[in-house]
């Protein structure tokens, strides 16, 4: 395992970490006095497919006599990553949010210390969000003026789990012991449904989070299989996360179907078995609302019950009331031929279904080939139910000799347990829905040419509708695609997952809330943190607004400890510095720009050595792309492509000059 060392902190800070970890609650303190209080803590949750965003807004108030620093120890929700920071200030007399910049942790801490100190320069008012330990962040805000307040906002991402047809997250109580957070939930996206504590919701305010809140998003889905592939490079390997999801409903009962139910009436069956077949047929038909039905019974010969199509409700009533006389013979093949003929003669254009139940005790000359020859004429999906057991149960039997015949139609052979008892009726209806429509994806397999043997893990062979599987791992190769395949009844379905850029960025951040954290080296952490814009052991957010405090009201060195701090004699806290990188290593910045933009230029279709791009940076930010110079004739499409690539650059922390112009030859 890579050696991940965290700098030691003061004794007071260590006690604070222990207390916060044990209580799993936030703590809010002032540095100079005990009269700094948190007045509001609002959380806005937005659920997405596979993740949720928590936008957290907090306001602190200072009733002390001097400008003070707010120290907010944040116990993050399970799996969370912090990906943004803003502080509310004023500009030209108007309220304005000032967004934070993600920086190397040491550099952010040094900059915060510089900005909060006493000096004769024009003051700036910063907020620093830094990593303290897994599951805990520290938010430092200075200054909070006497009798004034300060509002800050940070953004957390959390992974959801897909279960029972919904993307779910159980949000535990947030806030301090005395002030629980107030929760609101954004309305769901178009077509999706939101559940709060198991009940439908349109979103809105939910009030204080006094206990765990169960949030769920039921996705609108037209495909039986879904999922996501996320890949984030660490420099030496990749964080790879894939998920597969069976839709909340992988299929639907067809409307206007033509259905023939075939019941074995041979004498090898008991009266109870005949009644069980009738109960199974009635339970199956209960899922059709507007089907046309014919019933066929068979011994040596097949016999139609009606000689015409009847409404599904009538067929169900008659099945319960009609006595079926048992006869010699078990001509399954003749019964199938009769049913196929009925369906083939029916008007075209409607879904067709054929269900036959039997004990499969048949003549020896009835070979599987005859069953195969008896089906397929009408195009109906054929299910063959072999009676087995007394209680309601259905299990596919792909090893049965008749299975190949049924599979050619899209249907299956089943072990069918049934009961005519009134007490079993509800369970019968639930079980026999699987003949009306597929309820699960069977024979699930995953494949990718970029995954090592055994890397995928124990993939479930069956995914019931509404259930999923996910896996997070390191891979040596950049996974280009993952194919998921399975069967609905006997129909093959598949989904090919390609890397999603947004998901890759998201999981670059969420890796810091995952089980992979302890295996990351510091260079890998930096790579992922910059890609995911996340607070990490090596990165922090620093938000700066124009200052309003007197320059004499800065923080004295040694007074930035935990709690009230001053006069305690406790060691000072190195703010926001949990990185062991120290100073960022030297970097040829012009070469970095040339390499990064050269790659983009080539991807845009440019020829090396033919272009120059002029841009300006302020610290690690591209503030202007002045022009792109290309040889004649002018190519506006190429110019635009290269310009957009420059605007998309993520500069490393070694770009630390206040203002620089660059002319980069590509």
Give residue spans per PLM region:
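N-terminal, polar/Ser/Thr-rich
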Residues: 17, 22-50
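An acidic, Ser/Thr-enriched
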Residues: 73, 84-132, 136, 140-262, ...
């Amino acid at each position: 395992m890579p050696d991940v060392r965290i700098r030691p902190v003061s004794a007071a800070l260590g006690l604070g970490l222990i207390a916060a970890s044990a209580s799993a609650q936030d703590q809010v303190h002032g540095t100079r006095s005990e009269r700094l209080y948190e007045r509001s803590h609002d959380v806005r949750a937005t659920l997405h497919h596979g993740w949720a965003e928590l936008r957290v807004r907090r306001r602190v108030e200072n009733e002390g006599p001097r400008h003070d620093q707010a120290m907010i120890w944040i116990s993050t929700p399970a799996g969370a990553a912090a990906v943004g920071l803003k502080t509310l200030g004023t500009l030209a007399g108007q309220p304005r949010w000032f967004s934070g910049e993600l920086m190397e942790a040491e550099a952010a801490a040094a900059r915060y210390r510089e900005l909060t100190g006493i000096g004769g320069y024009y003051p700036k008012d910063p907020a620093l969000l830094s990593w303290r330990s897994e599951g805990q962040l520290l938010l430092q805000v200075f200054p909070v003026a006497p009798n004034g307040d300060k509002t800050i906002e940070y953004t957390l991402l959390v992974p959801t789990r897909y279960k029972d047809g919904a993307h779910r997250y159980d949000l535990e109580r947030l806030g301090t012991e005395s002030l629980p957070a107030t929760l609101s939930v954004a309305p769901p996206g178009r077509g999706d449904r939101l559940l709060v504590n198991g009940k439908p919701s349109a979103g809105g305010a939910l009030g204080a989070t006094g206990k765990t809140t169960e949030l769920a998003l039921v996705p609108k889905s037209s495909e039986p299989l879904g999922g996501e592939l996320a890949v984030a490079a660490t420099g030496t390997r990749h964080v790879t996360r894939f998920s597969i999801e069976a839709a909340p409903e992988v299929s639907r009962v067809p409307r206007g179907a033509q259905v023939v139910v075939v019941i074995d009436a041979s004498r090898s069956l008991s009266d109870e078995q005949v009644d069980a077949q009738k109960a199974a047929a009635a339970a199956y038909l209960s899922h059709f609302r507007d089907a046309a039905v014919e019933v066929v019974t068979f011994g040596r010969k097949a016999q139609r019950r009606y000689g015409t199509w009847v409404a599904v409700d009538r067929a169900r009533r008659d099945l319960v009331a009609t006595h079926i006389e048992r006869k010699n013979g078990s001509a399954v093949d003749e019964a199938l031929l009769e049913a196929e003929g009925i369906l083939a003669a029916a008007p075209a254009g409607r879904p067709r279904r054929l269900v036959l139940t039997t004990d499969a005790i048949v003549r020896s000359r009835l070979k599987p080939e005859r069953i195969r020859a008896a089906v397929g004429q009408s195009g109906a999906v054929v299910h063959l139910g072999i009676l087995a057991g007394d209680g309601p149960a259905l299990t596919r039997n792909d090893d049965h000799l008749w299975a190949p015949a049924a599979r050619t139609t899209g249907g299956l052979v089943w072990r069918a347990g049934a009961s005519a008892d009134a007490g079993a009726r509800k369970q019968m209806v639930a079980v026999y829905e699987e003949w009306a429509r597929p309820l699960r994806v069977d024979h699930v397999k995953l494949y990718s040419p970029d995954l090592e043997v055994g890397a995928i893990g124990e993939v479930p062979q069956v995914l019931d509708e509404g259930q999923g599987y996910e896996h997070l791992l390191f891979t040596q190769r950049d996974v280009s695609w993952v194919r998921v395949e399975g069967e609905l009844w006997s129909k093959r379905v598949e989904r090919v997952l390609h890397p999603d850029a947004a998901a890759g960025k998201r999981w670059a951040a969420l890796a810091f809330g995952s089980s992979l954290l302890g295996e990351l080296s510091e260079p890998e952490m930096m790579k992922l943190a910059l890609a995911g814009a996340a607070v990490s052991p090596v990165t922090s957010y620093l938000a700066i607004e124009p200052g309003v405090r007197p320059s004499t009201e800065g923080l004295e060195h040694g007074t930035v400890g935990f709690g009230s701090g001053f006069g305690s004699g406790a060691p000072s806290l190195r703010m926001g510095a949990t990185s062991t990188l120290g100073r960022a290593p030297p970097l040829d910045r012009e070469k970095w720009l040339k390499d990064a933009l050269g790659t983009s230029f080539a991807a845009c279709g440019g020829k090396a050595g033919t272009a120059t791009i002029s841009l300006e940076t302020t610290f690690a930010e591209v503030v202007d792309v002045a022009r792109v110079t290309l040889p004649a004739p002018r190519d506006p499409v190429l110019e635009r492509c290269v310009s957009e690539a420059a605007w998309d650059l993520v500069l490393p922390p070694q770009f630390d000059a206040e203002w620089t112009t660059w002319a980069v030859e590509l």
